[in-house]
Amino acid sequence: MRRVNVEELRKGDLILVRWMDASEIRCSMDEHEGSPEIYCKDWGVYLGVSGRKRRLLLVGKDVVEVHNDWGAARIPLELVDEILLVMPRKETLKAIREIQALGRRVRLRKWRKGEIERVRVV
């Protein structure tokens, strides 16, 4: 992984974004003053930058294949601390195709109602 700027990214790159999120917490004033920042990490597919009033980094999380609808995080660029390129677009597409091929080769066993044992989670 290497640190990159938004300008270096191409749509389809797999990225990890470290950014500061707004939060609400109840604690003493000392704790508020000691560490007020809350950092988050989001990773996914870079979909671009958008926004009218503020520029937002779009990070794709999942896609509904039938409609080609993307679920995405919309992160204000001014809150981004760093962006790491996990895998360039070309390698990401290759990895996804390999995973899809593996999924087609895996056979799932169907269980009948009487065959399933009850499991108690403690």
Q: For the regions a protein language model found, what residue spans apply to each?
A:
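Conserved RNA-binding domains used in RNP assembly and mRNA/RNA metabolism
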Residues: 2-122
